[in-house]
Every structure is written in structure tokens, then in C-alpha cells.
Amino acid sequence: MFDCSGYVLRIYKQFGVNLDRSTSGMFSQGESVAKKDLQVGDLVFFKTTAAKVGHVGIYIGNGKFVHSSTSQGVIVTNLNDPYYWGKRYVGSKRVAS
């Protein structure tokens, strides 16, 4: 089972894209993308602690993203979930074209 950044790293590596191992490192890579301009494959980031970006997933279209947690495995979630992820969204990056 992967944590969030390990899952993203593995997926992108299959397509020949090299990413940093950490979520915060991934957040410093690529081109920033506005939420309204998200495309399939863009990375979406969330602030899970008061201090830093702590979670990453891959946008899959229709307002949803796929991500991994050590407790639930790989799951698909609504990006605009009003109870958790929607409130914690901090930005998106395009690292592959």
C-alpha cells in the first residue's frame, strides 16, 4: 500500500515523468493551474496540517481525483467535497503535457 506521494510517483514514473518523492517537493514542480482549468492528469494538492501541503492526488475529470492513503488504499473522491477535501484544497500543478 502506498501513501499519497508514493502512489503519484509510481503512476507518473510509468509515463516517464520524474517527480520529487515528497508531497511538498511535488508542489514545487510543474506549472500552476487554476482549479477551473484542471485537466486529467494534473496534480491536486491539499493542506492537511496547519503548516504545510500534506496530500496529493491526480485529477481524473468531472470534479474528481484519485489518491491513496495508508488507511484506505486508492480511492476516488470529489474535489469539492464540502466536508473535508474541498476546504483543504491549496492548488494544482501540471507536470506532464
Language-model segment annotations:
Residues 37, 50-53:
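Short glycine/proline-centered loop/turn elements that form peptide/ligand docking sites
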Residues 7, 57, 92:
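Short hydrophobic/aromatic patches on the structural cores and recognition surfaces of FHA
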Residues 17, 28-33, 50, 60-97:
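Aromatic- and glycine-rich peptidoglycan recognition patches
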Residues 20-23, 55, 94:
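Short, cationic motifs built from Arg/Lys/His that form the positively charged side of catalytic pockets
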Residues 41-42, 63:
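Structural motif
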Residues 1-40:
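Catalytic cysteine-centered active-site loop
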